[in-house]
A protein has these predicted regions:
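A short acidic, helix-capping loop that chelates divalent metal ions and anchors anionic groups
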Residues: 34-39, 123-130, 191-195
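Canonical Radical SAM [4Fe-4S] cluster-binding loop centered on the CxxxCxxC motif
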Residues: 7-46
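Short active-site-proximal "capping" loops at secondary-structure junctions
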Residues: 33-35, 70-72, 98, 221
Length: 241
């Protein structure tokens, strides 16, 4: 059976959050001291994850993305990847990139080709400020390692007005020199602030004016509140901006 929602949209893409734990403390995500975590008995083990994934694949899901928290800090991540790789489905993963170098071989062995890396700034100082960890160089080097090993890399960047919105063009310029794509994600604070889509989209649409190939991720932003604009290496003009 095909999974269809009330708007008649067919769903073939499943996201599985493997853990709520993370080795960063991003300011927009959690306080410096962390958050209360669920007991281990409330977290799915690898057999349960496989059983759920198998059921969805049998119901026409063709792609599964593993997320967190930080999925690569699960101690049984290699077992999970191996079991899911046995299913007829495309596997992808979203990570903060800190421990990627430890898992490159396993990711390759399990035919994971598409990896999204969360990186909100190209400044080492800003990275430390927003993540409360001094790991920028590690993450950036692991992105280069992914490229070297032939993975398809997409960078997810949360744009925060007054913090890193001045880096939009720097992010985009990077696609001229590295075979990567960028996806800008809106900042959605947890304090009840109203989201102003007109204000956000105006800032993001500066990119097309500079000659970059951009793709709006969904015409109706009501259904696309977290993915607004994707900047890719395709069609990029060979010039500085």
């Amino acid at each position: 059976a095909i999974l269809t929602d009330q708007f008649k949209r067919k769903h073939t893409y499943l996201r599985i959050s493997l853990t709520e734990r993370c080795n960063l403390r991003c300011t927009y995500c959690m306080p410096a001291e962390g958050v209360p975590l669920s007991p281990k008995t409330h977290i799915m083990n690898y057999d349960e994850i496989y059983a759920i994934a198998k059921t969805f694949v049998e119901n026409v899901v063709t792609k599964i993305r593993l997320t967190g928290g930080e999925p690569l800090i699960r101690k049984d991540i290699h077992v999970i990847l191996g079991k899911l790789a046995s299913l007829p489905v495309e596997l992808a993963i979203t990570t903060n990139g800190i421990t990627l170098d430890r898992h490159i071989d396993v990711l390759k062995e399990n035919n994971i080709k598409n990896i999204n890396v969360s990186l909100d700034t190209l400044s080492e100082g800003k990275f430390k400020e927003i993540t409360r960890r001094n790991q920028f160089e590690k993450v950036y080097n692991n992105i280069l390692l992914l490229i070297e090993k032939g993975f398809n890399v997409k960078i997810n960047a949360v744009l925060i007005k007054g913090f890193n919105d001045d880096e939009i063009i720097d992010f985009i310029n990077l696609t001229k020199y590295l075979p990567i794509s960028f996806r800008f994600i809106e900042f959605m604070p947890f304090d009840g602030n109203k989201w102003d889509k007109n204000k956000i989209i105006n800032a993001y649409l500066e990119a097309p004016k500079k000659g970059f190939n951009t793709e709006l991720m969904g015409k109706d932003l009501f259904y696309w509140t977290s993915i607004l604009l994707q900047i890719s290496k395709k069609g990029l003009e060979n010039r500085d901006i």
